[in-house]
């Protein structure tokens, strides 16, 4: 009941999410398995066959809810926001932490990187809500080169583990 505006271009009306263009015309979002519940976004993870709660920034941050931001770009942004002052080793550890959550056998964590990063109730990564991640998503990195190097290295280590059983060290 009522309208809850989440961002200048997104609103939830009676549990249905709409996107508004610059002229104010509303379009019902389709193909997305999510609903707005208070300050959280309830998302259905088809792989885990389970619902998870995301922070409202899931809809507010451009390219996240619709999946337009690639896993690599999101992971690099998280690495820089969480551990930008810790060099490649620290950033790679952050990336591996996110990636490891995607294969949690107990399904306490979602199966997609964007879902893990934005998971709420409780908040998994404070950089989602404190503005640090959004800053990186807008291109303002502290150490872009090392963030991408760490994200790529972690993705390779993780892929080798999942596909070949190679240790994640």
Predicted regions and their residues:
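Extracellular adhesion/carbohydrate-binding repeat motifs centered on closely spaced tryptophans
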Residues: 1-63
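Bacterial extracytoplasmic/cell-wall-associated proteins, especially those involved in peptidoglycan
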Residues: 65-169
């Amino acid at each position: 009941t009522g309208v809850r505006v989440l961002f200048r271009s997104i609103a939830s009306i009676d549990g249905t999410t709409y996107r508004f263009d610059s002229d104010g015309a509303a379009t019902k979002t389709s193909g997305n398995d999510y609903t707005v519940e208070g300050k959280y976004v309830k998302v259905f993870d088809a792989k885990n066959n389970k619902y998870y709660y995301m922070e409202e920034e899931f809809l507010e941050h451009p390219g996240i809810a619709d999946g337009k931001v690639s896993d690599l770009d999101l992971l690099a942004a998280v690495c820089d926001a969480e551990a930008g002052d810790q060099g490649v080793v620290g950033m790679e550890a952050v990336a591996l932490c996110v990636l490891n959550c995607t294969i949690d056998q107990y399904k306490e964590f979602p199966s997609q990187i964007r879902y893990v990063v934005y998971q709420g109730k409780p908040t998994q990564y404070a950089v989602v809500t404190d503005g640090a991640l959004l800053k990186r998503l807008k291109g303002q990195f502290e150490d872009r080169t090392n963030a991408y190097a760490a994200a790529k290295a972690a993705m390779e280590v993780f892929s080798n583990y999942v596909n070949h059983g190679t240790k994640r060290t």
